[in-house]
Regions:
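Alpha-helical transmembrane signal-anchor/signal-peptide segments
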Residues: 32-53
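Membrane-embedded segments
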Residues: 58, 62-152
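Secreted/periplasmic serine-hydrolase-like ester/acetyl group-modifying domain
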Residues: 128-248, 329-350
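Short acidic-hydrophobic catalytic motif
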Residues: 351-374, 378-501
Length: 501
């Protein structure tokens, strides 16, 4: 009898344990299902990259949008990961760095100094200068930074240091508390994300912007000696980041990602030089380096770079890290497949944006990557001739001022841009383009006052321009695969906007 009772007790205990395990599993799956996936989409690859990454890129959205790990690896073999966060003030950057070091210790840290002037620690308090909307946005942005990291000692320390309200801190410990109401808005990506299937467009943490802001304001450059001298919480936490680097034997490099900043922002950026001097480390203020970017073609907004600006900035930074700092070249070494895959994803992303651009500005910007071959046709007297930003983007491709010459002639303009054969040919007045050899065939173009003929291949009478359905279109762009020579796209634009077929 005693044996039977003992067996029943054991059975009850086992059933209770099994029930608790099933309950925990269901809660875990529900938590993963309803969470917003942006944090794991942004930094999910970090945990695989951490043991191999030589460089961590830290900072605000300027870092996310401005430094591309795929460019660093493709051009220089630099194995990096972009841990920048939207709206990251330096206290957030510090704690993200602390949590990241639980998974790997890089040899180098590149730290963007933007938002150095911010003088608050608690995101849910801030100062009188910020609104409730600012505080709410900061908490949302912190979720994107921190949700990917498992809850533990350092995440708990981050929340205690960054959020004063204990109820808000609990949301970060259990995503289900914050996101339980998302059941009605779940999408396919939410279910795939439960099982770790990758989603989204981040490239090793970088998020590239394939748009152009043609209305960026430009400001005179202030002298580097003009600085923001006030002590701030931002400066305190930058020093904490540098102290942590010293403790972990990580070599830090301070940077200012370039953009068209006003005079006050320039003075704030310049003040990072004093902290760099204090620690005896480099400060690369790229706003004082000539010709890294052209703000009129390389920015997505007044303060953020687009994908082309990011490529240029990353190429400049990579050259410095490689030749002057001594970051190793990992190309050809085993174990860096994650970076090789990121390079492939990057180029696939470029082509996808070429074939489905936001507008004509975005299209011309993205064609600068030379991932496709193209023919650009502008109809006679098109508004595109009178848009200075569009002309600058075309001149980036052609390498000449030919588009300026053609503006106002009442004649069509044609540019043949073929990176495979290094061909850049454009119309000059009424002189036809004859027998231009390209990777996708022989091109001929004739422009008349009321008609233009573009042929590709042997049949010189077959017009590749669509005059039947789109004769009044401002701009037509033909896109060719550089490997096969096949036409993969024919895009139409009116008044700068994409006309979808």
């Amino acid at each position: 009898m005693r044996i039977r009772k003992t067996g029943q007790k054991i059975q009850k205990v086992l059933l209770t344990v099994l029930f608790l395990l099933l309950l925990a599993g269901c809660l875990y799956l529900a938590d993963r299902l309803v969470e917003r996936k942006d944090s794991r989409e942004k930094n999910g690859d970090y945990f695989a990259a951490a043991p191999k990454a030589d460089v961590l890129l830290l900072g605000s959205s300027h870092m996310i949008n401005g430094i591309n790990p795929a460019v660093l690896y493709e051009n220089f073999g630099i194995a990096s990961y972009n841990l920048g966060g939207h709206g990251n003030v330096l206290p957030v950057t510090y704690w993200e760095f602390v949590n990241a070091l639980d998974y790997g210790t890089p040899k180098y840290a590149v730290i963007d100094t933007y938002l150095l002037e911010k003088d608050y620690q608690y995101l849910d308090v801030m100062t009188d200068a910020e609104s409730d909307a600012d505080r709410s946005a900061a908490i949302d942005q912190l979720h994107e930074v921190m949700d990917a990291f498992p809850y533990g000692k350092n995440k708990r320390g981050a929340l205690a240091d960054l959020i004063s309200d204990s109820s808000l801190r609990r949301e970060f410990a259990f995503d289900f508390i914050r996101y339980h109401s998302r059941w009605s808005s779940l999408e396919r990506g939410d279910y795939e994300g439960v099982f770790g299937k990758p989603c989204g467009e981040s490239i090793l943490g970088a998020q590239l912007r394939y748009e152009v802001d043609p209305g960026v304001s430009l400001y005179p450059r202030v002298d580097p000696s003009e600085k923001f001298e006030e002590a701030t919480v931002g400066k305190t936490y930058l020093r904490r980041i540098l102290d942590l680097c010293r403790e972990k034997d990580i070599f830090p490099i301070l940077v200012q990602v370039p953009f068209a900043e006003n005079e006050d922002l320039q003075r704030i950026a310049n003040s990072a030089q004093d902290i760099a001097d204090e620690y005896g480390i480099p400060f690369l203020n790229m706003n004082y380096v000539e010709n890294i970017i052209n703000p009129e073609t390389d920015q997505q907004s007044q303060t953020h770079l687009n994908a082309l600006g990011a490529a240029k900035t990353s190429a400049w930074l990579g050259a410095v890290l490689s030749s002057e700092v001594g970051v190793p070249d990992r190309r050809g070494e085993a174990g860096y497949e994650l970076w090789e895959a990121a390079v492939r994803k990057y180029h696939q992303q470029i082509v996808a944006n070429i074939l489905n651009p936001e507008d004509l500005y975005a299209e011309l910007m993205t064609l600068n990557f030379n991932d496709v071959s193209t023919i650009i046709f502008i109809n006679n007297d098109s508004v595109a001739f009178y848009d200075e930003s569009l002309r600058k983007l075309i001149k980036n491709l052609s390498g000449t001022d030919g588009i300026d010459v053609m503006a106002g002639t009442k004649l069509g303009y044609c540019l043949i841009h073929d990176p495979v054969t290094d061909t850049n040919e454009e119309t000059k007045g009424t002189v036809p383009l004859e027998n231009i050899k390209t990777s996708f065939g022989t091109v001929n173009f004739t422009t008349l006052e009321n008609y233009d003929l573009l042929s590709v291949g042997e049949n010189t009478d077959e017009n590749q321009l669509d005059y039947v359905n789109n004769g009044n279109i401002d701009v037509q762009i033909l896109v060719y695969d550089p490997a096969s020579g096949e036409k993969i796209g024919h895009l139409y634009f009116r008044d700068g906007g994409l006309v979808r077929g």
